[in-house]
């Protein structure tokens, strides 16, 4: 099992974690004009 040779400083760890943010799904406009999430099936029209 790997063991770190030295402690990672708070600043260095924080710099590494800057890209850990949550990406929100952006809704897209469907053909019928309603908003939906991409890659999800529409309940009413059954379109992908």
Curated annotation (Swiss-Prot):
- Biological process per Gene Ontology, one example term: translation
Q: Which residues cross the membrane?
A: none
Any one of the GO CC terms: large ribosomal subunit
Molecular function as annotated in GO: structural constituent of ribosome
Q: Does the keyword Ribosomal protein apply?
A: yes
> Which keywords does the record carry?
Ribonucleoprotein, Ribosomal protein
The family annotation for this protein states: Belongs to the bacterial ribosomal protein bL32 family.
Protein name per UniProt: Large ribosomal subunit protein bL32
Q: From the UniProt record, report the name of the gene that encodes this protein.
A: rpmF
